[in-house]
Every structure is written in structure tokens, then in C-alpha cells.
Amino acid sequence: MGRLAIIVTFFALLGQSPTTFDLSTDFSLHDNPDKAWQFGYSETNSLASNQFRIDQHVDDLHPIGFWHPAVNNGPGPGYYPYVAFNSTQQTQYGSSNGWAARAGEVAMEASSAGQYSMVRFTAPVAGPYKVSARFAGIHFGLSTTDVHVMHNDSSLFDADIEGYGGDPAFHKVEGANPTAAYSGDINMKAGDTLTFAVGYGKNKTNFGDTTGLFAQVILIKNKQ
């Protein structure tokens, strides 16, 4: 086999190898959109794809930074819904020490008006993808939220979180449904979206609702 043929074969095989998009690894507190990921919220109390809005303000705090809809003065207008991230290698307390996020965990909370906190993935190319998501209540007051995984406007997964399912060194695991997980395979076109969303739950209040998320999307094989 000639050198050119070997090079062509190598890149063809490389293009067919799995590509992993890991939210914890890829998360940025500087760029939004961040490669294939966007951090945002719903304009209204709706999961419709056209309601997604990108967060415009970042509090690049340490150890946990926050994306917010707009510049704000703390809890109130512009603060909720938020998408936060623990960039360290160990569990850290969140705002007011009322919750804790594990290493690499994204923390999400809806607004009191029912706007969803959202993380969105946009497929860079067409192909089969493996999707996994793990949600957990991480507020010490026991989170009561609804969590979702959407493909464009179609629901892949819906569940309720009731309880605490985070780091047991910070609070005991308790509640009727402290965690929820999804795993599935899906074919996507380039530009298709996956949305991971957290709402304010059946009690329709976001008080004490911080919910953790780990998510991963793997492109199994590029369509040639």
C-alpha cells in the first residue's frame, strides 16, 4: 500500500472513531456557546425549542461559577434560572452553603416563574449518538424538581427529583426520588439539539431546588 493510501485510510478510520462530548470536561465559564454546548434557560414555562435563550452574564467565581440570564445583584431579576459549575477536583459548597456540587458537576435551578434552567448540545455532524444524563437533588433542603432530556422538540426522558442524592459526605441521601438517570441511542442530523432541563417541580416553587447534572454525548460514527 502506498504512503498516500495509508494516510487516506488513517484519516477515514479516524473520522469513524467515537467522539466524546463530556459536559464536565467541556464546560466553560468564559465562552457561551462553548463548542457544541450552550448554557441558558427558557423564556417561558415551556420546553419548546424556540423558547431557549442563551445566558448573557457569567460570575466566574471560585470554586463554583455561574451563568445567569443577565447582570444581577444576587437572587432576583436576572439571577434565575442559573447554570453553575464546580471546576475543582472535590465537592464544594454552593451559594449560602445550602447545597454542594461534586467535582465536575453542573448545578441548575429554575426560576420562581417556572422558566427552565437548560444546557443544550448541538450535533456538529449527522450520525448515531449515545446519550447519558444523571440528575440528582443536591440541595440540603431536599430538591423538588422536574428534569428532562429533549431531542429537538421531542421528549426522550422526563422524571421528578424529590430528595438529596449528592455527595453523602455533605448530607445523607434521602427522599422518594433523589436521583434520575437516562441512557439511550439516537440518530441526529447536523444541527439537531439535545436539551437537558431542570424545572421547578410539582410544588411550583424553586426554593431549595438546586439539581446536579452529569451529561455525556458520544458520536459513535460519522456518516460519510
Language-model features and meaning:
Residues 4-13:
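Sec-dependent N-terminal signal peptides
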